[in-house]
């Protein structure tokens, strides 16, 4: 795919990430020199601000009741607390797992499953003990990233479950992995932020992009663990199709 990479020995790896725990052994590492780390939430807020600047109107905290085809070529979206539906020429369904309850009454069935992931974010205690960029532990499938003056550890994905049920074992694995590779890097005892989030996937892992089969309704769903990486490209595809 044209992605530059190089296999490194432990000695070579420690020259790039010199804060790696010397007591944690590993066979080798794969270095992706062009990879970068970013704050997904911050980027989303910046995109929102830019969209508003060029005239996009957002309706936050609006609870959608149902979606129906209109008498014309678009769709009508019913909103709780409003007597009349809102008409649109086109609508894009991108509501994650909640999309199924809107699509099934329209005859559109997509075999999406919920996958939940965990993360811990904490301030850096000693910059020299923190990662320079990002490290992925392939054994536990956990990523350790540096975001300015914070460290974020993310992974421990699970199929199914609910957002309300936060497994302590999943967080223990995150803390263990951080301590394995970067002990003493962050203030875990003072305000560490624990998070659990949901995403959707199809059995084959590829997202659903394009027409739904319902006039005026388009789909942008099930990006799995690559949601941020695929977001701008998916938006470009949707804009071109619509």
Pin down the residues of each PLM region.
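Dinucleotide-binding Rossmann-like beta1-alpha1 core, especially the glycine-rich loop
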Residues: 1-10
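Generic structural signal for residues in well-ordered beta-strands
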Residues: 5, 58, 64, 190-191
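Helical element adjacent to the flavin cofactor pocket in flavoenzyme catalytic cores
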Residues: 23-90
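Mid-domain beta-loop-alpha active-site segment that forms a flexible
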Residues: 31-48, 97-98, 170-177, 223, ...
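Short, conserved active-site loop motifs that form the nucleotide-linked donor/cofactor pocket
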Residues: 55-57, 151, 217
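Active-site substrate-recognition segment that forms the wall
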Residues: 66-69, 74, 85-215
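Claisen-condensing/thiolase-fold acyl-transfer catalytic domains that form or cleave C-C bonds
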Residues: 143, 224-232
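Internal hydrophobic alpha-helix adjacent to the cofactor/substrate pocket in enzyme cavities
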Residues: 231-242
